[in-house]
């Protein structure tokens, strides 16, 4: 019996298919990532950041779910599953936190995510 052999042409086609499949899967996983982060900072230097438990209480009382609350370099970072949750939380925290705190969207350091968000936001400008 003869064993079937893979020709060079078949090997190239299989490799190209696997490469395309890998690229598609990586693109899909990047596009699905919609995580959003808010940063709470004190306006005045030396002022303490708000208590994470009070922030948790305000968000929970308004039905806003979050992934994590993390202190980092004199600010409090709150991570959400979606930009909609982040926007709702910003509205609630702007109303409930005392004056002297700034609630702002945290810029993502990942360059790929920045480019994808730019393309999503400006897609209506094409054509």
Curated annotation (Swiss-Prot):
Cytoplasmic side: 1-10
Organism from which the protein derives: Salmonella agona (strain SL483)
Protein name: Modulator protein MzrA
A single cellular component GO annotation: plasma membrane
Source taxonomy: Bacteria, Pseudomonadati, Pseudomonadota, Gammaproteobacteria, Enterobacterales
Superkingdom of origin: Bacteria
Oligomer and partners: Interacts with EnvZ.
Record GO terms (molecular function): protein kinase binding
Record key words, sorted: Cell inner membrane, Cell membrane, Membrane, Transmembrane, Transmembrane helix
Subcellular location: Cell inner membrane
TM regions (residue ranges): 11-31
InterPro entries: Modulator_MzrA, SecD-TM
